[in-house]
Amino acid sequence: MTSRARYLVGIDLGTTNSAVAFVDGQAADKRVTLFDVPQLVAPGEIAPRRQLPSFLYLAGEHDLGPAETALPWDRARRTVVGELARAQGARMPERMIASAKSWLCHAGVDRQAAILPWGSDEPEKLSPIDAQAAILEHVRQAWDATHPGAPFASQEVMVTVPASFDEAARELTLEAARRAGYGPIVLLEEPQAAFYAWVDSHPAGERAAAALAPGSQVLVFDIGGGTTDFTLISVGADGESFDRTAVGDHLLLGGDNVDLTLAKQVEQRLVAASGRKLDALEWHGLVHSCRLAKETLLGDQTQESVAITVAGRGSRLIGGTRRDQVSRDELELILLDGFFPLIERGALPQRTRGGLSELGGLPYAADPAVTRHLASFLHRHEVSRIDAVLFNGGAMTPAALRRRVVDQLAAWQPEHGAPRELANRTPELAVAQGAAYYGLVRRGLGARIRGGTARAFYVGAASTGGRSDTAVCAAPKGLEEGEAAALARDFELVTNRPVSFRLFSSSSREDEPGALVPIGDGTPDLVGEGDSDLLELPPIVTVLRAPGRSRATVRLEVRITELGALEVWCRDTGGEGQWRLSFDMRAGGAARENEAAQSDPDPRTPEARGLIAQAFSGSGPLKPAGLMKALEETLAARRDEWSLATLRALFDAALEVEEERRRSPDHEARWLNLCGFTLRPGRGATLDEWRTRQMWRVFNLGLAHEKAEACRLAWWIVWRRIAGGMTQGQQEQLYDRLAQLFLPSFKQKKKLAEIKPTREETAEMLRTLANLERLTVSSKIKLGDEVVRRLGEGRKAREDGLNFWALGRIGGRVPLYGPVNTVVPPQRAGEWLAAALDMDWPDPEKAAFPMAQLGRRTGDRARDLDDDLRARLSARLRAVPGGERLARLVDEVVALEAREERVALGDTLPAGLRLLPDSD
């Protein structure tokens, strides 16, 4: 992008469809024009289309030939984007990537990993970021092919994102653009873009504001393929200006949810007719067919029904095809009753532990009723009157849905009557058109929507009571592009090592900088359900490089760049430097469920740290053997009651005396045990990634007293306890080291005979291996196969329950901390479970819980085991004392209780801490 760019390009990067529009900045008539995107519409056939379907198809060796996927600008292209990708995906869903935008926001998977198409057995896959980048790259290359004299890299580009996207999701979008070869881009919220398109739709010389009375409140009601966005825009008292006054929170609720609901109804009929449930890929094919049927029925008012075909796979391909149909009446009933029910204004979204997760575990909104989410939005922002509604998104094409929303608003505001519907002739294109128009606004040639940032930002701070239960407002809502807000509060930080701040946002609070507010649990509460509406973002981290100084006093500054991105800076009050803080995308993975986990270190922690230094350095009477008891006495609490912050402070103290572990075997064993206990489970606190890196340096150094069994035991225990903080590469390295002992080759068996690990060592090795959730699937399969082999060696191998526990961890359906994309496929896990069910269980209570983890239901067909196998397991579990609860884990989608989580992990957790899967 340059300041003299000829074209202003707006890109609607949609979940289901993308679109591009532009303005020629050098033309006398600066009107918005659609860019018809060249794309493959049939094998070997290129044609321009007004929309670019946001689908990717990864062509195989036999389905599409090289000439059929070639593009004019890339003859060797094998990844198809657009119309052909959508059509071909209906035939081979295992090669199609859909809803990449939703996956980009899914914190439960590694968004850098090649995991899409989800649940597919095909070897070629893409990461969510690379899938989004492929769509953006297609736009760039298509533009360059049709505008040879105006390369895309030289134009000013605006890319839209949902208004509800947090800063982490926006940063991932920027990364996708960078991978697509884009220069700096401007991010614009989709509802604002839709409103800009409405402004631009008025004839030249006619002011859009004149169409609305001064003080009017306009609701932009935007439902796309993957998200629902509510934005409130008010008309200024002068009748000349617009202000964005409120935005809703992130809702993964859109057309995809309709497709899923429709597919579930069709599947019920198919199963009733054939007696067989669809497998994961057949289900994906059905969902895609229902998506196409929905689009057909909504786009063609003359068609009353659409045929649905689900082809069988493998041995079922011939004669395995199943057919049904979707009628217009069925679709409208689902939409009106399920997604747009008429409700009382006080009705709020239902909160459950998960909504639809049939499409690969995407974290969809638990309550599909859009009207309930709308009621919550209006209540939260204290909106009593809506004067006009601008509908946007393909999902709002049916007039019946728009009437339902208008009628609902009218029922909520009888004293004001029904709001007026603002005309939007092309809701599927308006966002791209508005984004291009915004380029003119940035040049001072159009009406700007004021309001700045939709959220206020807060930094975690200890209150006067020493508790980290408050945050201080660092930047208010409404910061405009190019503006900054400085927090008049000093922070004293350690230099030359990582420092971190907890960062929060709120879309509803109106605090001024410096205001203290309660944090709550870091999750925005529904109205009436708590005293906090702060949403916790990934923490912001940096290293303050200041040679010769151990500490620095700094102040924070929040800036909104000219491109609309959030930046947080740390400025030295002594004027010696400034540091930009970046979002730690790998942070998280643990939820603090009570104030014990949120608290600052115990006030007596400095004294406790001194005990650690004394015990290991030999500077006083305290010896390592008596250290833990001394720490409990000093902190006046049992070790399992120490808060997360206290534990990490003690770990940091232990790290400072790492060299002292070499003094004796007892020093080393006690030091390793202390580190494992105080850093467990390796995540949950900011800077845990850095702490784990410091421990990995110890791993590479190895044991100082390798011949001492106590040291060898402590060695494996520490890596098991902190595995949650390890990267996949570190876990694979640990696996390779252990595999030589646990899965030895013929040559390694001879070496193993020389080492002769004790039974206790072998048990700790297995526990460590089983806790490595980030291992590749292939490594887990090798490990699980070996455990099943050992279980089959005889009754003695099944008596203590260790092998059962290990199998439950290795093949568990729901990770405790790792990404779901490394879960063992259900086919292999099913084989393991079937083998275990054929064995006797000497101690059923020791086997029952891990086998429940192996067969646990997730709601994700790419992970769930066969229904009949789970039914066998459920019956077996019910025969065990307390087995009703375990059977429920297998029969239903339910979360683990804290006690069950500890059993699954094989360890205790710091007070108040709960594990969550990876948030990347």
Q: Which residues does each PLM region occupy?
A:
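Phosphate-binding loop and its immediate beta->loop->alpha context
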Residues: 30-180, 189, 257-307, 311, ...
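Glycine-rich phosphate-binding loops at beta-strand->alpha-helix junctions
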Residues: 157-172, 311-315, 362-367, 385-408, ...
